[in-house]
Amino acid sequence: MKKVLAATLAATMVMASAMTVCATTENAGSGSSSSSTTQETSTPATYAEANSQSAGASVKVGGVAVQTSIAGVYAAESLKGVAVTTPAADLAAALSLTSGQKAAIIIYDTDQKKSTAAMVSVNAAIEALGGADLVSTLNIDLGAKQNGKWVTLSNGSVALKAGLPKTADTTKTYSSICVQPGGATTILEDQDTDPTTVTFAVQAGLGTYAIIAK
């Protein structure tokens, strides 16, 4: 089994399914609202419709076919496939979906130039961990669709499985750094035992996820 990541960051740490800390970002504010959903007036940019997948579609993750349970845009090119592995039957409860809502997701690569504020938090977390290799950074928007409109979710999470790049060192321990709007930063441990993949929890709403190796 892979080693479990254990680290103390220079901030208040709360143990749950992951280690949560506060890291400074530009224009950092308070945490997200506790409301279940917020209706947006329009759908967010879908970033490469050619990479759309339907719910239940077969996606190659680390060379192995995996069914992704959420429809959306899977545009991450820095990894060997990504798929939501939370069972479709569990999505409504996991994300507090109401009648008529269907889970939806948008995943794409980002970097220092595109996500400057979030990367400040990512780099601070890496430094607090004593250093780590940055493997890939993704922007992920986990929401829902209702009557053709995007619904922003604020509660719940799903499991996302990602195939590590071909050049990844499989002897290292992999984890993910999640940065949410406002600067809240969470270290997410790998939930699977496959040395060629990493599985972590994706929170409802928009977040930046940096996969690291240590």
Where in the sequence are the language-model features?
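Gram-positive cell-envelope targeting signals
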Residues: 1-27, 175-177, 187, 209, ...
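Feature for mature exported/ectodomain regions
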Residues: 2-3, 17-136, 152-166
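Ser/Thr-rich low-complexity repeats and stalk/linker segments
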Residues: 73, 91-94, 124-143, 173, ...
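Tryptophan-paired
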Residues: 145-147
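Proteolytic-maturation and junctional protease-sensitive modules
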Residues: 150-214
